[in-house]
Amino acid sequence: MMKKLLLFVMITGIISTAHAQIENPVTWTYTAKKIKGDVYELHMTAALEGKWHIYSQDAGDGPVPTSFEFAKNPLVKPDGKVTEVGKLDKEYDPNFKSTLRFYTGKVDFVQRIKLKSPVNTLVKGKITYMVCNDKKCLPPRDVDFSIKINPKS
């Protein structure tokens, strides 16, 4: 009987640990929108669960800001920097001893690009971000993305 109880406790602990390690309150979606001619907007949208928030690219001192790294693509030229569309919150955080900038609910990160040739291509890259709620922060996370550009459609 004790062996079964011990086994049950161990399995429950392993499952709880595994669940905690894969906690991910962010869902990312990726789309391309043709603006005009050879100009497109890449939309990398973060939807956050509950009271979780994601930090701005200019987060403040302390947390890891959201950042974007685009893979080289000879068919694509970036046009400016990634912009943020959403309700930006600013709040002093005594843990970081800094005023932090973040988004709750949803934020759309937008990168304009120019297509050098009217052919289908993929824009690939990596997003690094960190999320927190009022109780804890999760470690920074990297997410790879791939966005289809189809100028003929």
How should these model regions be labeled?
Residues H19-S153:
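Extracellular/lumen-exposed scaffold segments
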